[in-house]
């Protein structure tokens, strides 16, 4: 996953991300700027997942939403 491409499309994907991870606020999602590592960190923190679980969820999310 190319973080630059993700960042460029992030505004289009924030609604889908909010649907996937409803406990994250719009502001938090905006602040990640589509950065996969930041997003995974938020998911890890908010949902109590391991780093690997959060990274896998983020990777799968971006694979489903190219």
Swiss-Prot record:
Gene3D superfamilies: YjbJ (1.10.1470.10)
Phylogenetic placement of the source organism: Bacteria, Pseudomonadati, Pseudomonadota, Betaproteobacteria, Burkholderiales
Origin: domain of life: Bacteria
Protein name: UPF0337 protein BP1738
Matches recorded under InterPro entries: CsbD, UPF0337_stress_rsp, YjbJ, YjbJ_sf
Family in the record: Belongs to the UPF0337 (CsbD) family.
